[in-house]
């Protein structure tokens, strides 16, 4: 379902790593570095919180899409992909949330 969309977006973001920053928003963010990307992720997370408080489902979906997109840019900055996050979610599927949390604290 959504894997192909995430994969296509991820490929575009990866391609933008080598694009001219004057011609691509993603290239600008990647060129400016991690602090600029983190600032944008924090901004988008705040917008998600506000959209949730507004109780407007379509606005919430819009803002979550922005947050996911900018998080994917952050992942790309670290040479990671959305697929890595999906793999982690898949690994956790079927695990009790409490058991998974306990396993993290034991490590």
Swiss-Prot record:
Keyword Ribonucleoprotein: no
Domain of life per record: Bacteria
Coiled-coil parts of chain: none
E.C. number: 3.6.1.31
GO molecular function: ATP binding; phosphoribosyl-ATP diphosphatase activity
One GO process term, biological-process aspect: L-histidine biosynthetic process
Main localization (coarse): cytoplasm
Keywords: Amino-acid biosynthesis, ATP-binding, Cytoplasm, Histidine biosynthesis, Hydrolase, Nucleotide-binding
A GO CC term attached to the entry: cytoplasm
Catalytic activity: 1-(5-phospho-beta-D-ribosyl)-ATP + H2O = 1-(5-phospho-beta-D-ribosyl)-5'-AMP + diphosphate + H(+)
Keyword Nucleotide-binding in record: yes
The protein's annotated pathway: Amino-acid biosynthesis; L-histidine biosynthesis; L-histidine from 5-phospho-alpha-D-ribose 1-diphosphate: step 2/9
Disulphide bridges: none
UniProt-annotated location(s): Cytoplasm
InterPro entries (alphabetical): HisE, PRib-ATP_PPHydrolase-like
Family: Belongs to the PRA-PH family.
NCBIfam families xref list: histidine_hisI (TIGR03188), PRK00400.1-3 (NF001611)
Protein's UniProt name: Phosphoribosyl-ATP pyrophosphatase
């Amino acid at each position: 379902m959504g894997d192909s969309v995430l994969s296509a977006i991820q490929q575009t973001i990866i391609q933008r790593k080598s694009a001219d920053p004057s011609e691509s928003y993603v290239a600008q963010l990647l060129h400016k570095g991690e602090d600029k990307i983190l600032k944008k992720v924090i901004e988008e997370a705040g917008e998600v919180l506000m959209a949730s408080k507004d109780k407007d489902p379509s606005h919430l979906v819009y803002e979550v899409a922005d947050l996911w997109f900018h998080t994917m840019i952050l992942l790309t900055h670290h040479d990671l992909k959305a697929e890595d996050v999906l793999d982690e979610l898949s690994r956790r599927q079927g695990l009790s949330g409490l058991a998974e949390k306990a396993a993290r604290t034991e490590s």
